[in-house]
């Protein structure tokens, strides 16, 4: 293996990258609460893997969505475990994100020169909540349907553009197939890509600036 590594290192210069990744200085005041952001990332990766697996069986139509989820839970080998892990990690991600935000705020991690790190973190928090809203509707049961109807109707309170926003979200006047298609696309494509981009920016800035010092 050493010969293979040496061959790759000679061409790709792996050693400097490994040294930089593993040799970063960790301030002595860092404790377990500084791991909350990393746990949030782990939860996201778990959801990505389990969600990708479920796309092989889920059908995003109003006629088949509920039955396809039921099929995953009752017919697919370990499908019940797959979906349960997806749901548990989703709840854990939201909890860890909230605790991480509080930790950063209470320790002053948002102050100069880390304002942009804080901004990307806030965007990631919004994306995390958006995951929950869009994913909640995908089983298309009574809870999911009425949740979508209520959430998609909230923008109607906005003056002038409110009704147009509601129609844009729903794909028409009423909640239906177009709404489910939009939420499915957001949940499985748009939001994961946006989250991956902003997480990369977030972690690169942390690597560049380091962990903030104690108050």
Swiss-Prot record:
One of its GO terms (biological process) is respiratory electron transport chain. CDD domains: Cytochrome_b_N (cd00284). PROSITE patterns: CYTB_NTER. Heme c binds at residue 35. Its cofactor is heme b; heme c. It comes from the Bacteria. GO terms for cellular component: plasma membrane-derived thylakoid membrane. Binds 2 heme b groups non-covalently with two histidine residues as axial ligands. Heme b 1 binds at residues 100, 202. It is found in: Cellular thylakoid membrane. The chain crosses the membrane at residues 32-52, 90-110, 116-136, 186-206. Heme b 2 binds at residues 86, 187. Keywords: Electron transport, Heme, Iron, Membrane, Metal-binding, Photosynthesis, Thylakoid, Transmembrane, Transmembrane helix, Transport. One of its GO terms (molecular function) is oxidoreductase activity. It is a multi-pass membrane protein. The 4 large subunits of the cytochrome b6-f complex are cytochrome b6, subunit IV (17 kDa polypeptide, PetD), cytochrome f and the Rieske protein, while the 4 small subunits are PetG, PetL, PetM and PetN. The complex functions as a dimer. NCBIfam families: PRK03735.1 (NF002990). HAMAP family: Cytb6_f_cytb6. Component of the cytochrome b6-f complex, which mediates electron transfer between photosystem II (PSII) and photosystem I (PSI), cyclic electron flow around PSI, and state transitions. This is Cytochrome b6.
């Amino acid at each position: 293996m050493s010969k293979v590594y040496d061959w790759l290192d000679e061409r790709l210069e792996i050693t400097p990258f490994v040294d930089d990744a593993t040799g970063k200085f960790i301030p002595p005041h860092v404790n377990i609460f500084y791991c909350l952001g990393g746990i949030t990332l782990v939860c996201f990766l778990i959801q990505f893997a389990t969600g990708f697996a479920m796309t092989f069986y889920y059908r995003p139509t109003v006629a088949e969505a509920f039955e396809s989820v039921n099929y995953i839970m009752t017919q697919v080998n370990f499908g019940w475990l797959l979906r349960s892990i997806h749901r548990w990690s989703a709840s854990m991600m939201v909890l860890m994100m909230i605790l991480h935000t509080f930790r950063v705020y209470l320790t002053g991690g948002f102050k100069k020169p880390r304002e942009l790190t804080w901004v990307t973190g806030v965007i990631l928090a919004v994306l995390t909540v958006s995951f929950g809203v869009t994913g909640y509707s995908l089983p298309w049961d009574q809870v999911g349907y009425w949740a979508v109807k209520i959430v998609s109707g909230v923008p109607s309170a906005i003056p002038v553009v409110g009704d147009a926003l509601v129609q844009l979200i729903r794909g028409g006047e009423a909640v239906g197939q177009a709404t489910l298609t939009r939420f499915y696309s957001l949940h499985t494509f748009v939001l994961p890509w946006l989250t991956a981009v902003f997480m990369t920016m977030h972690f690169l800035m942390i690597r560049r600036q380091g962990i903030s010092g104690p108050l």
